[in-house]
């Protein structure tokens, strides 16, 4: 064979080998024009966007853009936390909250104290706390002559101001983790217009001991614009809420969730208030302390299965639940030690290394929820994580926990064709992103990660929607 054809064949062989590498599949592909146009309208440069698009079955990369660059993922960090939890604990795993009745019970009276020990359950909401106290009453207790003692020792974390992240301490997404987290340390105000009385009734849940909130606010005419601002509520003390403004009739019924302004005492006020509402009497007080270590609990309250918790974390991007899970993973690894943030970070990075290899600078773990300015992850690493999940025994559980575009959760307002993608969203002031699975017209399934880090990030949402729509149309296969 002449030398020139041999050299040509050798070159073709080299190209074939190189094209087996992920980069080769995307070297000639640019961003879709509709995505570029949407970025331009948002005044966001292409350099602010990272993308990794893979075929879910083969793992073949069909579009990559700065995929190895570590960027702030915002709530996409929850994918790492929830995937690790499903892998390490399993979808049916539950938290256990033990309860002790320390003392004899005679004629409806507990001659001693009631102890409740937290283990990180993120779903100890008012309804489940009611069930816990109802169980106490079913054991014959109507009056407690001692104290109700709350044990938070399973987590060893520093107290902090809920407003530290963004100055919005009254927003529930800023609530801090707690081994005994009750009702997300938040209250809910429901406003119900009563046209005949010319007021909106204010309903407060849950009942808190010592709480005094205005039970009504005057109705006003006009549109329902900034209805929260129109109330002119003083949020400095949520246990003594007063409204100096009005509520527009046009708003109909609305709900306003608020983080309690005194989280350190919230549990005590909630348990005392709920116990009293249930007809119980308490001669002592509700206080923090240590549960008995040498006796078996009188009973235990089981949480919903992990799958339900993961679904709520991912569908609705619940930060405090994600942080509870993050710390729980460390606690389960070393159950004889209180979980710390440092231990939780180490545990999560160890899991990523075991399952995906050493991430290096492509992963910076902070608090498990993504509510952070310091967290970092690459689009490549998130895509590999989603491929791992796709081929795992818990594939269906993780995928079903993600918002469905145009249907539910944080994706209900997506502009892409509804019902064809399961995608976790990530949003901060300067971050916008999605990560998950997209089903195309032909039935192909793609793994998609797209993140924008820029001051105008949220204006780039239409560009991300356009990228999702492009994948749905099988454009990557053309």
PLM-predicted stretches and their roles:
Residues 1-5:
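N-terminal secretory signal peptides that target proteins for export/translocation
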């Amino acid at each position: 064979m002449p030398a020139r054809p041999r050299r040509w064949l050798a070159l073709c062989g080299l190209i074939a080998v190189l094209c087996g590498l992920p980069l080769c599949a995307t070297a000639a592909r640019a961003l879709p024009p509709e995505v570029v146009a949407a970025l331009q309208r948002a005044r966001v440069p292409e350099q602010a966007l990272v993308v990794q698009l893979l075929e879910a079955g083969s793992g073949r990369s069909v579009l990559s853009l700065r995929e190895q660059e570590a960027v702030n993922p915002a709530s996409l960090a929850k994918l790492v936390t929830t995937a690790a939890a499903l892998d390490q604990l399993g979808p049916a795993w539950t938290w256990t909250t033990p309860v002790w009745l320390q003392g004899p019970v005679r004629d409806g009276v507990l001659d001693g104290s009631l102890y409740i020990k937290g283990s990180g359950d993120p779903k100890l909401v008012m309804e489940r706390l009611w069930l816990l106290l109802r169980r106490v009453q079913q054991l014959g207790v109507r009056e407690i002559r001692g104290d109700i003692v709350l044990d938070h020792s399973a987590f060893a974390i520093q107290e902090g101001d809920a407003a530290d992240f963004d100055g919005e301490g009254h927003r529930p997404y800023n609530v801090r983790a707690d081994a005994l987290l009750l009702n997300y340390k938040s209250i809910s105000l429901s406003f119900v217009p009563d046209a005949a009385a010319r007021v909106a009734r204010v309903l407060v849940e849950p009942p808190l001991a010592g709480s005094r909130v205005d039970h009504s606010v005057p109705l006003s005419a006009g549109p329902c614009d900034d209805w929260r601002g129109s109330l002119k509520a003083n949020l400095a003390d949520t246990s003594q809420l007063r409204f100096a403004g009005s509520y527009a009739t046009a708003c109909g019924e609305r709900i306003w969730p608020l983080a309690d302004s005194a989280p350190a005492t919230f549990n005590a006020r909630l348990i005392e208030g709920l116990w009293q509402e249930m007809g119980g009497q308490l001669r002592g007080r509700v206080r923090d302390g240590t549960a008995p270590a040498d006796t078996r609990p009188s009973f235990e309250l089981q949480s919903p299965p992990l799958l339900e918790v993961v679904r709520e974390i991912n569908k609705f991007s619940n930060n405090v639940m994600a942080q509870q899970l993050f710390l729980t993973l460390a606690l389960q690894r070393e159950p004889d030690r209180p979980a710390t943030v440092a231990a939780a970070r180490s545990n999560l990075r160890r899991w990523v290394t075991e399952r995906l290899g050493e991430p290096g600078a492509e992963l910076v773990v902070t608090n498990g929820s993504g509510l952070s300015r310091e967290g970092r992850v690459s689009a490549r690493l998130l895509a590999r994580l989603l491929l791992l999940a796709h081929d795992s025994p818990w594939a269906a559980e993780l995928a079903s926990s993600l918002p469905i575009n145009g249907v539910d959760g944080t994706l209900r307002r997506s502009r892409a064709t509804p019902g064809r993608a399961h995608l976790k969203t990530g949003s901060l002031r300067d971050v916008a992103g999605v990560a998950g699975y997209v089903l195309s017209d032909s039935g192909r399934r793609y793994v998609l990660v797209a993140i924008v880090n820029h001051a105008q990030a949220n204006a780039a949402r239409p560009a991300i929607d356009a990228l999702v729509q492009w994948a749905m149309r099988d454009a990557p296969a053309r």
